[in-house]
């Protein structure tokens, strides 16, 4: 009877240690993920300093001026 109890106690202690180990690993992984999010996210701009306006993008294709009399085509 005493051996069954000691085996049960050792099993419960092993399961408890396993649970603690897994929970610590999950917490460590979440902390790393949060740290990476902070590093990759852009800094929060200060409301006192306005950001400069973004210039419009350049045109994609160069269209030369028309050489025809009607103004259409090349």
From Swiss-Prot:
It comes from the Eukaryota. The keyword NADP does not apply. A motif (SxS motif essential for MIK2 binding) lies at residues 66-68. One of its GO terms (cellular component) is plasma membrane. A motif (SCOOP motif) lies at residues 60-74. Residues 42-62 have a biased composition (Pro residues). Residues 29-74 are annotated as: Disordered. It is found in: Cell membrane; Secreted, Extracellular space, Apoplast. Residues 1-31 form the signal peptide. Keywords: Apoplast, Cell membrane, Cleavage on pair of basic residues, Membrane, Secreted, Signal. One of its GO terms (molecular function) is LRR domain binding. Its main location: membrane. Interacts with MIK2 (via extracellular leucine-rich repeat domain); this interaction triggers the formation of complex between MIK2 and the BAK1/SERK3 and SERK4 coreceptors, and subsequent BAK1 activation by phosphorylation. Brassicaceae-specific phytocytokine (plant endogenous peptide released into the apoplast) perceived by MIK2 in a BAK1/SERK3 and SERK4 coreceptors-dependent manner, that modulates various physiological and antimicrobial processes including growth prevention and reactive oxygen species (ROS) response regulation. Belongs to the serine rich endogenous peptide (SCOOP) phytocytokine family. This is Serine rich endogenous peptide 16. The lineage of its organism: Eukaryota, Viridiplantae, Streptophyta, Embryophyta, Tracheophyta. The gene is PROSCOOP16.
């Amino acid at each position: 009877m005493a051996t069954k109890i000691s085996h049960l106690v050792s099993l419960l202690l092993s399961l408890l240690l396993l649970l603690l180990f897994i929970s610590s690993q999950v917490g460590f992984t979440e902390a790393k993920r949060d740290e990476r999010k902070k590093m990759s996210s852009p800094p929060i701009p200060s409301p006192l300093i306005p950001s400069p306006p973004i210039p419009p993008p350049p045109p994609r294709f160069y269209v030369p001026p028309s050489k025809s009399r009607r103004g259409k085509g090349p």
